[in-house]
């Protein structure tokens, strides 16, 4: 099987693509890949490091207001389609999959027009502009949230989940807890604000640290590397309780996620895929700084099923943070109910499901 993959702009589009590629390599060692991204996007540094052949095109997104830039974007799109067709003809893929971001537009559109089987993968509950546009032309639209399905032609929608979920399975949670200094018998909560951290969550944590010191559970707090020194400076003035462990970054996140009892985090699509695959209850603090407020809508999909609580950033204080953690961790029945609800939402074999959809299209 020859697979052309395109996705870029943010890690939320790139890492699911790479997780899918790794799964296909396991199931089909003979498979060959080409990844098309943008020259300056995050994918241009991440993908080549994995050894996957990479090509780039020039593309940008539409501005929401009428502007001359949109004329340039149309011109870039048309040029991107021509460049994509050239790469496609040269690589001769059996199937093309787009995982989101502007770069998918010309690549997947070009493939569809050339009669090659095509799929787009939508990670969020609210689809991006590119995937909505492409849904008219592709063979299948793979989704991770039921709420996303209503935005696409129903005959094309398949629920596969996020391939990243498959990569957190079969991890050693006890090893994960030991690696960060958590004790095995005690309940624990992991609090983090994404790979770069989140200042409002850091501020609430610092305010809460003295009260956390009186709790029977342990707290693992991940600041994000850019915030670590500032947080530790503030913590020194208040004191660091024995049951609170602070780290700038965690390199073995799947192991640690497996080991803890509760997670407090943003509501990015990849994070939710991992948490539900593991059956982890969560307190979700959606980032209000994302397109279409999609994190709040992602969170709502999990909260409505009883697998999480949602704490909006505008309501985030030391008191509300501790309240929500206590209500879950200190009540065994609530904790168990939320674990079951999260597990029912999870799709741990998402990468395999997506590969099956691809296989069916190729064999048609």
Swiss-Prot record:
<dbReference type="GO" id="GO:0071555">
    <property type="term" value="P:cell wall organization"/>
</dbReference>
<dbReference type="InterPro" id="IPR004276">
    <property type="entry name" value="GlycoTrans_28_N"/>
</dbReference>
<dbReference type="Pfam" id="PF03033">
    <property type="entry name" value="Glyco_transf_28"/>
</dbReference>
<comment type="function">
    <text>Cell wall formation. Catalyzes the transfer of a GlcNAc subunit on undecaprenyl-pyrophosphoryl-MurNAc-pentapeptide (lipid intermediate I) to form undecaprenyl-pyrophosphoryl-MurNAc-(pentapeptide)GlcNAc (lipid intermediate II).</text>
</comment>
<keyword id="KW-0328">Glycosyltransferase</keyword>
<keyword id="KW-0573">Peptidoglycan synthesis</keyword>
<keyword id="KW-0133">Cell shape</keyword>
<dbReference type="InterPro" id="IPR006009">
    <property type="entry name" value="GlcNAc_MurG"/>
</dbReference>
<feature type="binding site">
    <location>
        <position position="195"/>
    </location>
    <ligand>
        <name>UDP-N-acetyl-alpha-D-glucosamine</name>
    </ligand>
</feature>
<dbReference type="GO" id="GO:0005975">
    <property type="term" value="P:carbohydrate metabolic process"/>
</dbReference>
<feature type="binding site">
    <location>
        <begin position="10"/>
        <end position="12"/>
    </location>
    <ligand>
        <name>UDP-N-acetyl-alpha-D-glucosamine</name>
    </ligand>
</feature>
<dbReference type="GO" id="GO:0050511">
    <property type="term" value="F:undecaprenyldiphospho-muramoylpentapeptide beta-N-acetylglucosaminyltransferase activity"/>
</dbReference>
<keyword id="KW-0961">Cell wall biogenesis/degradation</keyword>
<dbReference type="GO" id="GO:0008360">
    <property type="term" value="P:regulation of cell shape"/>
</dbReference>
<feature type="binding site">
    <location>
        <position position="250"/>
    </location>
    <ligand>
        <name>UDP-N-acetyl-alpha-D-glucosamine</name>
    </ligand>
</feature>
<keyword id="KW-1003">Cell membrane</keyword>
<feature type="binding site">
    <location>
        <position position="124"/>
    </location>
    <ligand>
        <name>UDP-N-acetyl-alpha-D-glucosamine</name>
    </ligand>
</feature>
<feature type="binding site">
    <location>
        <position position="295"/>
    </location>
    <ligand>
        <name>UDP-N-acetyl-alpha-D-glucosamine</name>
    </ligand>
</feature>
<comment type="pathway">
    <text>Cell wall biogenesis; peptidoglycan biosynthesis.</text>
</comment>
<protein>
    <recommendedName>
        <fullName>UDP-N-acetylglucosamine--N-acetylmuramyl-(pentapeptide) pyrophosphoryl-undecaprenol N-acetylglucosamine transferase 1</fullName>
        <ecNumber>2.4.1.227</ecNumber>
    </recommendedName>
</protein>
<keyword id="KW-0472">Membrane</keyword>
<dbReference type="GO" id="GO:0005886">
    <property type="term" value="C:plasma membrane"/>
</dbReference>
<dbReference type="GO" id="GO:0009252">
    <property type="term" value="P:peptidoglycan biosynthetic process"/>
</dbReference>
<dbReference type="Pfam" id="PF04101">
    <property type="entry name" value="Glyco_tran_28_C"/>
</dbReference>
<dbReference type="GO" id="GO:0030259">
    <property type="term" value="P:lipid glycosylation"/>
</dbReference>
<dbReference type="InterPro" id="IPR007235">
    <property type="entry name" value="Glyco_trans_28_C"/>
</dbReference>
<keyword id="KW-0131">Cell cycle</keyword>
<comment type="similarity">
    <text>Belongs to the glycosyltransferase 28 family. MurG subfamily.</text>
</comment>
<keyword id="KW-0132">Cell division</keyword>
<dbReference type="GO" id="GO:0051301">
    <property type="term" value="P:cell division"/>
</dbReference>
<keyword id="KW-0808">Transferase</keyword>
<dbReference type="GO" id="GO:0051991">
    <property type="term" value="F:UDP-N-acetyl-D-glucosamine:N-acetylmuramoyl-L-alanyl-D-glutamyl-meso-2,6-diaminopimelyl-D-alanyl-D-alanine-diphosphoundecaprenol 4-beta-N-acetylglucosaminlytransferase activity"/>
</dbReference>
């Amino acid at each position: 099987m020859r697979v052309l993959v395109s996705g870029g702009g943010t890690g939320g589009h790139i890492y699911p693509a790479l997780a899918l590629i790794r799964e296909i390599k396991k199931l089909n060692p003979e498979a060959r890949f080409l990844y098309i991204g943008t020259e300056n996007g995050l994918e241009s540094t991440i993908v080549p490091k994995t050894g996957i052949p990479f090509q780039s095109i020039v593309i940008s997104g539409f501005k929401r207001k009428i502007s001359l830039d949109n004329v340039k974007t149309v011109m870039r799109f048309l040029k991107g389609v021509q460049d994509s067709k050239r790469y496609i003809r040269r690589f001769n893929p059996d199937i093309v999959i787009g995982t989101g971001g502007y770069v998918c537009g010309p690549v997947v559109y070009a493939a569809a027009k050339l009669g090659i089987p095509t799929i787009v993968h939508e990670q969020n509950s609210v689809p991006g502009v590119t995937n909505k546009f492409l849904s008219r032309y592709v063979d299948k639209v793979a989704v991770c949230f039921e709420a996303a399905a209503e935005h696409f032609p129903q005959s094309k929608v398949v629920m596969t989940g996020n391939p990243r979920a498959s990569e957190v399975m079969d991890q050693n949670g006890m090893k994960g807890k030991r690696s960060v200094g958590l004790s095995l018998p005690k309940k624990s909560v992991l609090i983090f604000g994404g790979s770069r951290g989140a200042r409002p969550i850091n501020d609430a944590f610092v305010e809460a640290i003295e009260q956390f010191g009186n709790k029977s559970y342990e707290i693992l707090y991940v600041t994000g590397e850019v915030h670590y020194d500032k947080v530790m400076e503030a913590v020194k003035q208040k004191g660091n309780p024995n049951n609170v462990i602070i780290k700038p970054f965690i390199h073995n996140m799947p192991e640690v996620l497996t080991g803890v009892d509760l997670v407090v985090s943003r509501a990015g699509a990849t994070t939710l895929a991992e948490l539900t695959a593991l059956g982890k209850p969560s307190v979700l603090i959606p980032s209000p700084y994302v397109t279409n407020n999609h994190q709040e809508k992602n969170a709502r999909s999990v909260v409505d099923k009883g697998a999480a609580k949602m704490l909006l950033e505008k309501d985030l204080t030391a008191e509300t943070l501790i309240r929500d953690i206590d209500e879950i961790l200190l009540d065994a029945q609530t904790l168990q109910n939320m674990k079951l609800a999260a597990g029912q939402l999870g799709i741990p074999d998402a990468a395999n499901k997506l590969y099956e959809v691809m296989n069916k299209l190729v064999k048609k």
